[in-house]
Amino acid sequence: MTAPAISVNLNKGQADMSKTSWIRSSGLGFAVLVGFAVPAGAGTLDSVKQRGTLQCGVSEGVAGFSEKDTQGDWRGFDVDFCRAVASAVLGDAGKVAFTPLSASQRFDALKGGKVDLLARNSTWTLGREAELGLAFAGITYHDGQGFLAKRALKADTALSLDKAKICVEAGTTTQLNLADFFKANSMTYEEKVYPSAAEAFAAFESGQCDVLTRDQSALHGDRLRLAKPAEAIVLPDVISKEPLGPVVRSDDFPWFTLVKWVNFALVNAEELGVSSTNVDEALKSQKPDVRRFIGAEGGFGKALGLEADWAVRAVKVGGNYAEIYERNLGTGSKLGIPRGLNQLWSMGGVLYAPPLR
């Protein structure tokens, strides 16, 4: 049964944040929040190594990013990123536990220590870093907010949506962007707010609204999940910038640096031509930039608290950025989303990583 639309209490997150801040300032630390013993002064990296498992927060089910397959195994772009981090840190891509989180749960779960890393198609914003005590470890996917509309509405662009009933998930930048877009274009709409993406989708499918709005990448998967996909269309408009990326707590700079550089390593691997299929051959390379990548020169693994071959580990199982993208979102997936902005900067996109130097 589809949950009824609800009103959102915008002050709850502020109250939760205040409680978390008090606990931090009181010196109680993460041991209180996490629910298991953490040695005094231990950072996230030490905790992950001692536990032997990376705790990764993902979505409750977004096609191409994080969802369970028919065997119950987690698959997707964000899932593969978590596995790359686990492989770099623990030497085993399988040593990761996935925790599905709704949009309203995700940041509290991260702040409270329930997860070590959030890879849950989350948009990097000023407020989330400055107000919530979080840090985004780069951008893994350049997205934008779009609209999935019933063909019966006869809308061909977002400007055709005046007076439409629109389903949206609570606790997201999507709500804010929606209000800004309609106000800027002197249009009105009826907002139907739901506590999870799944409930917003169910409401759209059952006819409680004419339009579903969220990140455009997710809408392609939503359309395919409909009983009659041909009766809905993803409109071409993108009304916002949605830089999606992994998130960590802002009070652990070494862990932030590590996660950020695993992200960069996947991009650098694509630039260097290092992939899951040829990484063993790369170990024989005499090119200086490749030798730094494989850990033969530079000593960067030690600086991160990792083994010298940390970047090789990250790529060996799941592949470089291109392999991860194409398998989950691009030509090798059911979604078939063109890379667009997510192409390398040298190929017409904006994907760029600092050098391993």
Regions found by a protein language model. Name each.
Residues 8-11, 16-28:
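Bacterial N-terminal signal peptides that target proteins for export
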Residues 80-83, 87-89, 151-155, 159, ...:
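Extended ligand-binding regions for polar small-molecule ligands
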Residues 49-119, 304-306, 317-321, 344, ...:
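Extracytoplasmic small-molecule ligand-binding "clamshell" domains
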Residues 55-64, 74-89, 123, 143-195, ...:
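Bilobed "Venus flytrap"/periplasmic-binding protein-like clamshell domains
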Residues 96-108, 191-206:
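Short helix-initiation/N-cap motifs at beta->coil->alpha
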Residues 25-37:
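Bacterial N-terminal signal peptides
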Residues 300-357:
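C-terminal functional modules
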Residues 83, 87, 91, 95-160, ...:
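Acidic, polar ligand-binding/catalytic clefts
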